[in-house]
Amino acid sequence: MIKMNDITRDGNPVLRKRAEKLTFPLDPKYLKVADEMMEYLKNSQDPAIAEKYHLRAGVGLAAPQIGLSIQMASVLVPGPDNTIDLEETLVNPVIVSQSVQIAALEEGEGCLSVDKDVPGYVPRHDRITVRYQTLDGEEKTIKLRDYPAIVCQHEIDHLKGTLFYDHINKENPLDIEDNAILIG
């Protein structure tokens, strides 16, 4: 079970490396890692388990965040009324198209690997199309918008060695395009 002390923190060089592409069939150790990453997300979103193990809530976890420089990220995005908008482990994900429309989270972004609060808007594309492989090696393409799109962009950034605060305007953190959508 992944716990907070297993999360790689900002400052560790693995978070700034471009992760290695995975080949199929996946090594069984990577299948176990994928299960553990998704388990962390589920546990972190369960108030009782999160409190018991002192887990910070997360909607995404990329392999570099647990010290593995491989192109794999798990996402578990809750929807309305206890539904799930997106539950998937993405292997070798690539954003193949993106909207011109910019969006950002109204409250800014956070990250399990970044312990400090970093205020500011993180401009992202409101709609994206992601091509990736499943844990079985099947190639899939999904179209995402709004919050799930932002979550996937954040996790894919981890695979490129980019952290969310790299996108924040250094001069004026609350500056964003006039027509940007703020997602609250």
Curated annotation (Swiss-Prot):
GO terms for molecular function: metal ion binding; peptide deformylase activity. The active site is at 155. The keyword tRNA processing does not apply. InterPro entries: Peptide_deformylase, Peptide_deformylase_sf. Fe cation binds at residues 111, 154, 158. Binds 1 Fe(2+) ion. It is an enzyme of class 3 (hydrolase). Its cofactor is Fe(2+). HAMAP family: Pep_deformylase (MF_00163). This is Peptide deformylase. It comes from Pediococcus pentosaceus (strain ATCC 25745 / CCUG 21536 / LMG 10740 / 183-1w). The gene is def.
